[in-house]
Amino acid sequence: MIPEPTPDAGNLADAAWNRRPRRTPVYDHDVSLSVIEAITGTELAGLRTGDRSDREEFFRRYTRFFRDYGYDTVTFEALISSVLPGNGALYFDRPGSLKSRADFEAYPWQELADRFFERYSVDFELLAEHMPPGMKAVGGPGNGVFECVQDIVGYDELCYIRADDPDL
């Protein structure tokens, strides 16, 4: 008989601080929704983009997967690049939208935090509401600075800008 899961996010925190955890934590930086669907036999992807009740069900199922499969934490990221105007160079092979200093100066940098929270606040609230006891979330805003820059500039264009305007 498999024992009832007893997640403890402290195990991952201890390992991260190079302290011996009570037990070795189970962690994955990301688990594909299609993989979770295949393992559990339940739908997730369609719920993720639905209305609020769909999204509640998504987070209930999503967090339950991590608990039931022995994880101490729930991995969740909301991609910053998804709220960037003119995005798509990194993930969708579109031309970058920033090609010059003028484009850079005209870009709505000050709006980005509001756009991110507008899009994802409810998701983080629902994640917190459905977090199993003993677990914590790992992740948050996904994408680093370089990924975000690549997504609105494009890698090739970034190389040209570096040569043409190194101070940018």
Question: Which residues are covered by each model-predicted region?
Answer:
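Catalytic cores of TIM-barrel enzymes
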Residues: 1-168
